[in-house]
Amino acid sequence: MITSTSNAQIKELAKLQKKSRLRDERGIFLVEGPRMVEEIPKERIERLYISESFERKNPAYIRELGVPAEVLSDTVFSYVSDTKNPQGILAIVKRLEYTMEDVLGKSASKCEEKSGEKEKNPENHQIRVPHVIVLDNLQDPGNLGTIFRTAEAAGATGILLSSDSVDVYNPKVIRSTMGAVFRMPFFYVKDLPAAVKSLSSQGIRTYAAHLNGKNVYDEEDYTEGCAFLIGNEGNGLRDEVSECADCLIRIPMCGKAESLNAAVAAAVLMFEAGRQRRK
């Protein structure tokens, strides 16, 4: 058991919690909590830490997880935890590098490739019709995490983000995805307008959620390849991005509401596409 914050592993772990640049260089991110750790593909867990009280209270969970863990005293675990109320388990997880093809659903998922699922059950793998959510300068970690969860539930193929959007590997984002971050492909682009034009050139119709949209969102056809553009929480889509869209759409609202939360708007659009594709 590690009982000192002066331990080399603990010093490294504390640095990883505080410095995103270090996490980027290592190609890893941190995950806390038993529910989230359960969601991690086992081959991606680089190192696992548990508190002494967690070990004492959860022997069955630890056995079932089947991953060797380093035990920390409760005090040391609290020192390296990112949360006010530590849940007693923390994992260092290897990142996956996705491509645009992954986001468009044109290749086997990275999880399939890693586990060999595609080879074992080729009939379960199929190229999917693109259903993409495009995020322009999204800044709120909670919103991004919610969009990940919703995208998975609505059947989206992936998420495209401008390079100035919040970091997917921000600990708050990771927590709020509730595990979807391990399964939903995503890709950052430096030139979002060019990326939107590229989607259109590939036959993927792009729809910008916009207050000036002339078309009502549920009157469009999303059964073919589609991408929904969602803007910054306070400012919406930048003009140079919305101008590249094939169509500006709006979500009708009652009362005095001027706009919807970015994650809510994304959910409305993605689930409408999912509904149409289930027919």
Language-model regions, residue ranges each:
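N-terminal positively charged helical leader segments and presequences
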Residues: 1-84, 112, 116-119, 125-126
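Active-site/ligand-binding-proximal alpha/beta "capping" segment
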Residues: 207-257
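RNA substrate-binding interface of SAM-dependent RNA methyltransferases
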Residues: 109-112, 126-213
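Short amphipathic alpha-helix with an adjacent loop that forms part of the alpha/beta core around
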Residues: 101-108, 195-201, 218-221
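Amphipathic alpha-helical repeat scaffolds
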Residues: 33, 139-146, 260-265
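Acidic/glycine-rich phosphate/pyrophosphate-binding loops and surrounding catalytic core
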Residues: 89, 93-106, 124-127, 165
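Structured adenosyl-cofactor binding patch, chiefly the S-adenosyl-L-methionine
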Residues: 150-154, 168, 173-181, 239-279
